Amino acid sequence: MSLRAFMLCVCLLLQSVGARPASELQNLERLLQDQLSSTEHPEEDRLDRTREEPQLGGSSSREAADESALTRLFADLLRTSKRSWGRYKKGGMRSCFGVRLERIGSFSGLGC
């Protein structure tokens, strides 16, 4: 096959592929447009959600449970980090056999 024929086939193939957008691209474009419109009109979205909530029947309680679980998780992480910070500040690094000792027998935290 000659180079001219090959280039002609490639050009025709690119022309046919590029002539119409793929359905995935159309879906992506539609999603992006929806996202842009939702950021432009947050008041309307809030009104739409309040209208939809009675139809969903309990989604607000599920969302509240998810939010409370997330809040508990973050609160637990904050409490844990404060406790571990206090250990490092007072006693230094912990090892498998307990805390670092300045005097023998001053702590009884031996063991893994």
UniProtKB/Swiss-Prot annotation:
Tissue-specificity statement: Spinal cord, kidney, ovary, heart and spleen, and to a lower extent in brain and liver.
Range of residues in the leader sequence: 1-19
Subcellular location: Secreted
Basic and acidic residues bias: start-end ranges: 40-54
Disulfide bonds: C96-C112
Region (Disordered): 33-67
InterPro entries: C_natriurtcpep, Natr_peptide, Natr_peptide_CS
SMART domains noted in UniProt: NAT_PEP
Propeptide, chain numbering: 20-90
GO molecular-function term, one example from the UniProt record: hormone receptor binding
Gene Ontology BP terms: blood vessel diameter maintenance; cGMP biosynthetic process; receptor guanylyl cyclase signaling pathway
GO cellular component labels: extracellular region
Keyword tags: Cleavage on pair of basic residues, Disulfide bond, Hormone, Secreted, Signal, Vasoactive
Pfam families from the UniProt entry: ANP
Sequence intervals crossing the membrane: none
PANTHER family documented for this protein: C-TYPE NATRIURETIC PEPTIDE, C-TYPE NATRIURETIC PEPTIDE 3-LIKE PRECURSOR
Family: Belongs to the natriuretic peptide family.
Function noted in UniProt: Exhibits natriuretic and vasodepressant activity. Has cGMP-stimulating activity. May help to regulate body fluid homeostasis in a variety of aquatic environments.
Name of the protein in its database record: C-type natriuretic peptide 3
Species of origin: Oryzias latipes
Lineage, opening ranks: Eukaryota, Metazoa, Chordata, Craniata, Vertebrata
Gene giving rise to this polypeptide: cnp-3
